[in-house]
């Protein structure tokens, strides 16, 4: 089969590799579509823990079950499925196990024509989604659903701020918030992305590159009951100032690194909660799929590339030009 293969840091090729085989408890899925995440770019750039080359990246995928291994229900054969990229979560809902990993490293990922995965990580493809939309759903849907519902305990009367709108998780979080009946606001350095977020249901937004943006946003729309952030860095104290007393800040990344200082007194005096969130459990995945099907939500797909042009898909994500998920089709 053909697959995207990272032979070393910044060495991406389309390679011919052996077809995967389903061992006991596994299935082989012929992929109809896959999608990129920032994680794939960080692996390509050598900026991810536990690097192993060569590897096939990709955490998101949807396709048709082609074969099953020993012990797997044969009724999976021929079924349209999406893949839960959260592997070996473990028995606790509160946090993942030590054996937890994400599909696409160290296990071979979805940027290929076929993939072998545990049967326990399959779910029926939501019937209202096209293949490209279904492939765009797993990681962003799982991550955003857990951080909003399991961690932040989102309520319909909440006012929520999402920082850095445009990526898959942030955009799907916006869709979940709007569907739940809560009020969403966004930040971006792009007026176009803010405008497109408003078209999806956001109540407003702010350009975080503008001087005093946090003060202006607070006066116009704040404070916020929930703030969703994946950046961290030196602007983190602005988020503390924007949070309502008793509010929750949920972090699912730290792309700008650690802040040099944190306003701890404001956190304890105003009864704020700082919450971390990573991926999600099988229960979170099932809950996300139920919510998506009930509200007929569709992930935003920014652009679709054939597998042969995967390098262009990676380049688009590296420069941050996407609004929504970047999809690759074999």
Where are these regions (language model features)?
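Glycine-rich beta-strand-centered segment in the early N-terminal region that forms part
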Residues: 18-34, 47-90, 106-109, 126-128
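Adenosine-nucleotide cofactor-binding segment
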Residues: 162-165, 178-235
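Short, well-ordered loop/turn sites that connect or cap secondary structure elements
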Residues: 75-76, 154, 243
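Hydrophobic/small residue at the entry helix of a nucleotide-binding pocket
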Residues: 143, 168-169, 234
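NAD(P)H dinucleotide-binding glycine-rich loop of Rossmann-like/cofactor-binding domains
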Residues: 85-164
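Residue-level marker of beta-strand positions
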Residues: 79-80, 114, 159, 179, ...
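Glycine-rich phosphate-binding loop and adjacent beta-alpha segment
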Residues: 99, 180, 188, 231-300, ...
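C-terminal capping/lid region of NAD(P)-dependent oxidoreductase domains
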Residues: 2-4, 221, 296-300, 311-330
């Amino acid at each position: 089969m053909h697959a995207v293969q990272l032979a070393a840091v910044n060495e991406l090729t389309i390679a011919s590799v052996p077809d995967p085989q389903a061992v006991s408890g596994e299935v082989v899925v012929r992929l109809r579509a896959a999608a990129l995440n920032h994680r794939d770019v960080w692996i390509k750039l050598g900026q991810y823990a536990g690097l192993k080359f060569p590897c096939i990246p990709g955490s998101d995928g949807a396709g048709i079950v082609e074969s099953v291994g020993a012990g797997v229900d044969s009724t999976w054969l021929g079924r349209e499925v999406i893949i839960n990229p959260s592997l070996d979560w473990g028995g606790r809902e509160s946090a993942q196990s030590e054996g937890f990993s994400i599909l696409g490293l160290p296990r071979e990922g979805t940027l290929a024509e076929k993939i072998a995965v545990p049967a326990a990580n399959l779910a029926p493809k939501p019937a209202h989604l096209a293949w490209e939309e279904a492939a765009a759903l797993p990681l962003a849907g799982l991550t955003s659903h857990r951080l909003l519902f399991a961690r932040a305990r989102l309520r319909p009367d909440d006012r929520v701020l999402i920082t850095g709108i445009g990526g898959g998780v942030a955009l799907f979080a916006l869709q979940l918030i709007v569907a739940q009946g809560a009020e969403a606001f966004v930040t971006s350095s792009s007026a176009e992305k803010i405008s497109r977020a408003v078209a999806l249901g956001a109540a407003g937004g702010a350009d975080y590159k503008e001087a005093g943006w946090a003060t202006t946003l607070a006066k116009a729309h704040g404070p916020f009951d929930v703030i969703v952030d994946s950046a961290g860095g030196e602007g983190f104290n602005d988020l503390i100032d924007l949070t309502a007393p008793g509010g929750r800040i949920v972090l699912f990344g730290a792309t700008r690194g650690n802040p040099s200082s944190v306003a701890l007194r404001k956190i304890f005096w105003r009864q704020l909660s700082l919450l971390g969130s990573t991926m999600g459990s099988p229960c979170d995945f099932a809950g996300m799929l139920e919510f998506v099907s009930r509200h007929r939500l569709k992930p935003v797909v920014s652009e679709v590339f054939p597998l042969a042009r995967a390098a262009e898909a990676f380049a688009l994500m590296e420069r941050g030009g996407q609004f929504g998920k970047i999809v690759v089709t074999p």
